[in-house]
């Protein structure tokens, strides 16, 4: 996450196991932790980290406006905030990220699977390689200005 809520600089949370040997049952077969806890002082960002994960679910599965300035870092100089997510699912590396420019109401998105581009969006134009390796182009008639294009593809297929 970058320029998101109280995090001005890029912050990353890595759920890959380390060499600790305690709680081996907390590690999945693929080397990813099954869970974690966040511990820290008041107002240190614990809830913001959890919010960044919750927002992905909200943006994908419920009606939520991305262009809202409420997610913008109050200490930042930029009108954009970004969130990126990396998953390991059935041996496939999934990278999904989006950036919101609240000043000009523009969203950019990118989805990669095993480093292959699957979806790309800039503003109200997008291209998906999920169903067709040559790509299917979409324009303002298909791409919502304030919602994730990945959500649109999911609910329209």
Kindly give the residue locations of the regions a language model identified.
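Intrinsically disordered, low-complexity boundary segments flanking structured domains
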Residues: 1-2, 72-73, 134-139
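Pre-Walker A-like glycine/lysine-rich segment at the N-terminus of P-loop NTPase domains
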Residues: 1-54
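A generic structural motif
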Residues: 2-4, 86-90, 112-114
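Short loop/turn segments at connectors of secondary-structure elements within structured domains
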Residues: 7-9, 92, 105
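Ser/Thr- (and often Asn-) enriched beta-sheet segments in non-cytosolic proteins
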Residues: 12, 86, 93-95, 108, ...
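Residues in well-ordered beta-strands of folded domains
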Residues: 14-16, 86, 99, 151
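Conserved P-loop NTP-binding catalytic core
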Residues: 31-37, 41, 50-103
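Electropositive, glycine-dotted interaction segments
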Residues: 97-157
């Amino acid at each position: 996450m970058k320029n998101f809520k109280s995090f001005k600089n890029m912050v990353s949370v890595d759920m890959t196991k380390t060499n600790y040997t305690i709680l081996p049952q907390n590690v999945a077969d693929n080397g990813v932790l099954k869970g974690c806890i966040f511990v820290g002082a008041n107002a240190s960002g614990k809830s913001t980290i959890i919010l960044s994960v919750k927002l992905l679910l909200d943006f994908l599965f419920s009606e939520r406006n991305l262009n809202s300035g409420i997610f913008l870092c109050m200490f930042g100089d930029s009108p954009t905030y970004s969130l990126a997510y990396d998953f390991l699912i059935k041996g496939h590396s999934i990278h999904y990220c989006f950036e919101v420019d609240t000043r000009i109401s523009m969203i950019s998105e990118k989805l990669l699977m095993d480093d292959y581009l699957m979806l790309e969006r800039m503003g109200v134009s997008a291209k998906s390689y999920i169903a067709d390796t040559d790509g299917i182009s979409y324009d303002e008639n298909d791409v919502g200005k304030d919602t994730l294009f990945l959500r649109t593809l999911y609910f329209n297929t």
